[in-house]
């Protein structure tokens, strides 16, 4: 399963390392934008969400969505290679 995770922390440096550590702990990932990742994991959406939101507070935001083909965008070749491999 591939999920897109995008987040916005009210205080940009607050908990960023913890949030990114949790996202990256799911194994295979690619960071696309400053606060947007794609991850490839066998974990459920609920498991990913529960772990990733643990460092957020009421002023922060996060969305996690399942990603399926087709997919379009403006990315580097390295990012497209990741998508082709895992999606």
Describe these PLM feature segments.
Residues 1-28, 38-43:
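Extended, hydrophobic alpha-helical segments
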Residues 13, 46, 73:
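Loop/helix-junction capping segments adjacent to catalytic residues or to phosphate/diphosphate-binding pockets
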Residues 18-24, 49-56:
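Short amphipathic alpha-helices in soluble, non-transmembrane regions
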Residues 25, 30, 73-75:
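Short linear sequence motifs
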Residues 32-35:
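Short Gly/Ser/Thr- and Asp/Glu-enriched loop/turn motifs at secondary-structure junctions
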Residues 53-87:
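C-terminal structural segments of small proteins and small subunits
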């Amino acid at each position: 399963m591939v999920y897109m995770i995008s987040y916005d922390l009210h205080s940009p440096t607050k908990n960023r390392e913890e949030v990114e550590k949790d996202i990256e702990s799911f194994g295979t990932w690619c960071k696309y934008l400053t606060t947007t990742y794609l991850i490839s994991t066998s974990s459920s959406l609920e498991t990913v969400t529960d772990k990733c939101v643990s460092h957020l507070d009421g002023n922060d935001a996060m969305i996690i969505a399942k990603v399926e083909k087709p997919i379009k965008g403006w990315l580097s070749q390295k990012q497209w290679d990741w998508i082709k491999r895992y999606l």
